[in-house]
Amino acid sequence: MRLQLVALLFALVFNAFSHEHSHEHHHEGDGSEILTKVGWNDHSEELHDHHEHDHDHHDEQLIRKNHTSHREIQHSRLSTLKVWVFSLSAVVGISLAPCTLLFFIPAQHANGPFLKILLAFGAGGLLGDALLHIIPHSLSPHDHSHDHHDHNHSHKEHDHSHDHSNQLRVGTFVIAGILVFMMVEQLVRIIKGGHCHSHENGHIVADEHRHLNEHDHEHSEEKKQQVEGLKDVKASAYLNLVADFVHNVTDGLAIGASFSAGNTLGWITTLTVLLHELPHEVGDFAILVQSGFSKYQAIRLQAVTALGAITGCVFSLLVSNPGSLNNDADTSAIMPFTAGGFIYIATVSVVPELLESGDHNNLSKVAKMAQSLVHVLAICMGVGMMYIVSLVE
């Protein structure tokens, strides 16, 4: 009995000692966890401080980025203003330069020999512009259709089909330009057929009819043909003004798009258009004077057609992607249609006038042959000028 009590007491004491020891270990564990938590909190504070530092640094980067973006916007506005100023200045300069040159050309009678040479030069310029510049430029393949030309055979066939369809489209619009200009001229002749003179060349036709009454009857038919010839050429002069205006629109589109791509390209395009316009404007001036306009009337009309270049330039600068507009303008109906008009004016209106010029003067056969040779050389000079411009471009 005593042994059982002693064993029970010993068990109680040992159990109490074990509980106290485990309790101490438990509290020591809690303390280590507290220390661990305290250490972790210290590390968290460091991370928080580092996060605040990163946040401040991020704010500083945002401020700097906003400042840079603001400077880029200001620079972009200045660049846009520069493009507008350069483009419009180039267009105005190209328009004024030929008109200034025209003042130094001596005024002559419609059948003057020097004016006939200018007329032949203008015919060559029209043919060269249409056949050596406008049509080849419209037929040339564009970069976007040949960027991946070597990928596979089917893509090559697609490019070939695209080029063929483009050639057909350009040829169709050239023919359309010729037919439309012919129909317009026929319409003008029909409208003017019942009148002896129009509003613009009334004095010229009236003077010619006055001379008909003064000359002998044997010369009346020849004079009547000359009067009708003046009326016919007048219609072609208006057609030439329309074609020149449309052509100037395409020049303005090219200049605006070039300056949008870069100043260097813009000035190169400006020089090319200027070299192209100088002989072109001289020929147009000769056609207008030959049609019955006075020298200063012809210069004013040439200045009016220059508004087409300004219109095209402004439109090119207003669009979002001028470069693509320039490519679309080159392959659209505008340029080949204008080329057809130039071909019609040169071959139907100007060249026949040159062929008939020797029939109305009292020159020997040798002198007429020499005059025809000079006209051919003037046509070749006009074509040659456009050939050089095409090479430079």
From Swiss-Prot:
It comes from the Eukaryota. GO terms for cellular component: membrane. Keywords: Differentiation, Glycoprotein, Ion transport, Membrane, Spermatogenesis, Transmembrane, Transmembrane helix, Transport, Zinc, Zinc transport. It is found in: Membrane. Residues 142-163 are annotated as: Disordered. GO terms for biological process: intracellular zinc ion homeostasis; positive regulation of brood size; positive regulation of fertilization; regulation of egg-laying behavior; spermatid differentiation; zinc ion transmembrane transport. Glycans are attached at N66, N152, N248, N362. Pfam families: Zip (PF02535). It is a multi-pass membrane protein. GO terms for molecular function: zinc ion transmembrane transporter activity. Disruption phenotype: Reduced brood size, but the majority of hermaphrodites are sterile and lay a large number of unfertilized oocytes. Defective spermatid activation. Double knockout with spe-4 results in failed spermatocyte division. Double knockout with spe-6 results in suppression of the premature spermatid activation phenotype of the single spe-6 (hc163) mutant. The chain crosses the membrane at residues 85-105, 117-137, 171-191, 255-275, 303-323, 332-352, 372-392. Highly expressed in developing spermatids (at the protein level). Expressed in the germline. Belongs to the ZIP transporter (TC 2.A.5) family. KE4/Catsup subfamily. Zinc transporter which regulates intracellular zinc levels. Required for spermatogenesis in both hermaphrodites and males where it resides in an inactive form in immature sperm, spermatids, but is likely activated in response to reduced spe-4 and spe-6 function. Upon activation, mediates the release of zinc from internal stores in spermatids into the cytoplasm. The resulting increase in cytoplasmic zinc levels promotes spermatid activation and subsequent differentiation into mature motile sperm that are capable of fertilization. This is Zinc transporter zipt-7.1. It comes from Caenorhabditis elegans.
